[in-house]
Structure formats: structure tokens, C-alpha cells
């Protein structure tokens, strides 16, 4: 079959990115909109802890998908993807209409609609890693990077939308000469939470439409021996040598694929297993840090330097994710040693941020421009480096086909869960970290 025309790969990259955008957009949108909804919901600022628990419980989606695969082996893999997408679209649409509804539970008012829909969306998002990723085994490895770019957009776009909305804007009143300064003055948002959730629904609709477009580009593969993945997209097509090279860590060498098949080499299989385990371990560890440990301390590490530092860290850190995916499209590290070195750089930046959070509300260089630059740069480097490692490790695992990508999705989700569980006691039970109040200077001596 002829190689794909120049327009088709570009369109496929775009559709894959939009498809990936729908993976975590719903839960990311809920997180960035919490400062708005807590003003009207009865849980107040206890609401984030409720959402954290619900997102952790959302990992039950992994069990549901596993059970479905056991009960219906060999069934169409599009079914769970469509279920996840429908849950996301319907959940955010209902959230836009019902988020402010409350009901009495055990004699107290609770935001039952908001919490129930947040749980449904958490189920869908957690299941996306083990449904969306295996589907990409039908595409050459370079499109996997577009998927992770889309996942980065699922965090960046809700952040940008919240900034346009005016989330978190406040003004400190002038301090009196003798006396305590008054409370900070909050600005009214430019549009309500319902509008935000409708916009989020539109993003998920676009993601579902992109998946349908991918299905049109990639009809079911014909029953031919090997190589073809769909119409116009081939692993073995001319010009695809780079795909074979980067997927080789988990693929059979060409010398063995052709001619007589030699007997199994136990040592080679052992090395192959060790390499795969290292890549999966890197995926689990990096996602534990970026999706569990570090988000729990972001406000503690940034807010002592001011709201501007916090917003810059959130937005630029989210932008670092898709930028790292762009970099991986051109330069992909295929060495375990190289990925390990990059991971150590990310751990160093993460350790600095954790130290700032522990020392909050009076970390080093507070009140200086250097402190703001360092904390923002550390967040950008940390999230960017770990995003690159995640994309590179997943690209190398792509050669193992659908089972390897399924294992990658499980590693990502399990790592995220372990990171979140590890941070729950120090943040919510033992209160190791201390926040800084707005318009107050506890470090002024």
C-alpha cells in the first residue's frame, strides 16, 4: 500500500492530540474551578479533600475495565473508549446544570450533585489510561507523542480558561497605621461556573469527534500477514525506519523475524523483561510525583511568594507538558541511562519544591524576585522533564504492542494513586505543611 500523503499524518497528529485531550480534561477542570464553587457549596474549603478522595476512588474504573476484558475477551476495544467519552460529556453537561444543587445528608446540607458527578468523572478519567493508550497500538510510535501532547492540553486549557474567568483575583486593602488590616477583597468572576463547565463539555465533545475521525482514517485492518495497521498508516512502510528503531527495545530483531526462527534465548528474554520493568517503573515513579505528590504541595510551595508566582507556576507548568511532547517528537531519548539522568534532574527540582513547602509560610528568598523566579522555574523544569520521560518511556514500550501500552496505562494510574495516597496523611491528618494567609506577612520580624 502507498505511503501516506503529507496531509494525512498532519491530520492524524491533530486528531490524536484532540483525542488525548479528553482523557483528563474533566477532572482537571474540576480542580481549577474549585476556588469558584467553594464559595457557594456547603462544604466550603473542605471540598478539595472530598474531591481528592473521590479521584482516588475513581481508580475503581481500572477494575471495571479489567472485569469487562475478562468477561468479554476479544470484543471491540472501541466500546470502553466510547463509554468513557460518553460519561465525560454527560457528566460535565450535568455538572454545568446541577453543580449548585444541595441536599440534606445525615442532618447536614451537602453538595450531593457536585460530588456524585465528580466521582463519575473520576471513574471515566482513571479508566482512560487503560482504554485510550492501548488503542494507539494501531498507530506508529510517533503518534503516541501527540497523544501525550493532548493530555498536556487537558491540563493547560482548563487553566487558561480559569485565568480568563478571573479565578483567584483579590485585592489587599491598605493597612491602617495602627491596627490589623482588613480581609482581602475578592473580585467577581467574569463568567459563572456553569459557563466554565459548558466550555469543558465542548472540549470533551471535540475529543470524542476526533476519535470518530481517527476511526474513519483507520478502518479495521485487512486480514493480511503483518505490518499494516490501517488505511494509509503502516509500520513497515517506506520512511518508517525511525518507528522500527525506537520501538526495537520490545520488538523481535529483524534477523529473527525473517527466515528460520531460532530457539528462545533465556538471557535475551531476561534482559528484555528487565528493560520493560525499568520503563514501567519510570512511568509509575514519574506519575506518582507529577500526579500525586507534587500537586498536593503546590500551593504551599508557591503562595508564600504571592499569587502571581502561584498562577505562573500553574500555567507555565501546565504548558511545559505539551512543550515536552513537542520536543520528544523531534528528539527522543532511547537510553535508559539518559532517562534515568533526566529523572534525577526532575527529582532534584521536586526536592527543592518539597523543601519550600515544608518551610512554608516562610521559605528562603520570600519577598524577593529571585524567590519567585526560582519557584516558577523549578515547577516548569520539574513538570517538563517528567513529562518528557513519560513520553519517551511510553514510546519505547510501544514496540510491545497493545499489551505493553495497557501495562503502561496501568503503571501510570497505579503510580498516580500511590502518590496521592502517600500525601494524604501529611497534608490532611498530620498537617505537616502550613499555608500563608492572603494579605498577611507572618515572616515580618
Curated annotation (Swiss-Prot):
Going by the UniProt record, its keywords in alphabetical order are: Cell membrane, Deafness, Disease variant, Host cell receptor for virus entry, Membrane, Receptor, Transmembrane, Transmembrane helix, Transport
Enumerate the catalysed reactions. riboflavin(in) = riboflavin(out)
Mind listing the GO biological process terms from this record? riboflavin metabolic process; riboflavin transport
Q: What is this protein called?
A: Solute carrier family 52, riboflavin transporter, member 2
Transmembrane stretches, start-end: 14-34, 47-67, 86-106, 112-132, 147-167, 196-216, 277-297, 312-332, 339-359, 366-386, 404-424
**What, per the annotation, is the impact of changing residue 141 to T?**
In BVVLS2; decreased riboflavin transport; no effect on localization to plasma membrane
GO molecular function annotations of the record: 4-hydroxybutyrate receptor activity; riboflavin transmembrane transporter activity; virus receptor activity
Q: Where in the cell is it found?
A: Cell membrane
One Pfam family recorded for the sequence: SLC52_ribofla_tr
* Consequence when changing residue 339 to P: In BVVLS2; loss of riboflavin transport; loss of localization to plasma membrane; no effect on protein abundance
According to the record, the residues making up region (Disordered) are 228-264
Main subcellular localisation: membrane
Disease linked to the protein: Brown-Vialetto-Van Laere syndrome 2: An autosomal recessive progressive neurologic disorder characterized by early childhood onset of sensorineural deafness, bulbar dysfunction, and severe diffuse muscle weakness and wasting resulting in respiratory insufficiency and loss of independent ambulation. Because it results from a defect in riboflavin metabolism, some patients may benefit from high-dose riboflavin supplementation.
Family matches, as InterPro entries: Riboflavin_transptr
Topology in the lipid bilayer is annotated as: Multi-pass membrane protein
Q: Show the PANTHER family listed in the entry.
A: SOLUTE CARRIER FAMILY 52, SOLUTE CARRIER FAMILY 52, RIBOFLAVIN TRANSPORTER, MEMBER 2
Activity regulation as described? Riboflavin transport is Na(+)-independent but moderately pH-sensitive. Activity is strongly inhibited by riboflavin analogs, such as lumiflavin. Weakly inhibited by flavin adenine dinucleotide (FAD) and flavin mononucleotide (FMN).
According to its UniProt entry, this protein's organism is: Homo sapiens (Human)
Quote a single Gene Ontology cellular component term: plasma membrane
> In UniProt terms, what is the effect of altering residue 123 to P?
In BVVLS2; strongly decreased riboflavin transport
Summed up, the tissue specificity of this protein is: Highly expressed in brain, fetal brain and salivary gland. Weakly expressed in other tissues.
| Family label | Belongs to the riboflavin transporter family.
The UniProt function text for this chain reads:
Plasma membrane transporter mediating the uptake by cells of the water soluble vitamin B2/riboflavin that plays a key role in biochemical oxidation-reduction reactions of the carbohydrate, lipid, and amino acid metabolism. Humans are unable to synthesize vitamin B2/riboflavin and must obtain it via intestinal absorption. May also act as a receptor for 4-hydroxybutyrate. (Microbial infection) In case of infection by retroviruses, acts as a cell receptor to retroviral envelopes similar to the porcine endogenous retrovirus (PERV-A).
